[in-house]
Amino acid sequence: MIFTIGYDGLGINRFVQILKENEVRTLLDCRFNAVSMNSDFSKNKLALRLEGEGIRYEHLKEYGVPGKVRRAGNAIEWYIENIKPTIQASIVNRFEQPVCFMCMERSVDDCHRRIILIAMQEQGMQGRDLYPKGEKSAKKR
C-alpha cells in the first residue's frame, strides 16, 4: 500500500498525526527542492521530526518537478511525458512500508503526486491520498 499527501494548510503536528494514523513507516519527499516557506517542512527539520516519530525520511528529487517547469504552467503534462515512464513501483520495495509520497500541494488532483499514484496503480499497487477532506487550514497544530 502506498499513500500520498500534501502538507499545504496542515501544521506539522497534524501532518505527523495523519502519517501515524495510517502507520506510514517511510515518507518519500517528491519535491524537486526539499525546502518550504514553512520551515517545519524543509528537508532537515522535517527529517529530524519524523525520525523522532519513528518514520524514515527520504528525498526523491528525481520524482520532483523543476521550478522552471512549474513556472511555465505545464507541470502535469511535463511530468506525464518525462517522469511517469521512469516511475517503477519496485522503488517502494527499497523502503519500509507503507510509504507515503509527499509534496506541498494540498489537492492530489492538482499535483504531480497524482501521476506517481496512477503509475504505481498501473503496476499493480494499491494506494490513496491521505489529505483530510474538508480539513480547515492551519499554520500550526
Set out the residue ranges of the language-model regions.
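Residues lining hydrophobic/aromatic ligand-binding pockets adjacent to catalytic sites
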Residues: M1-R141
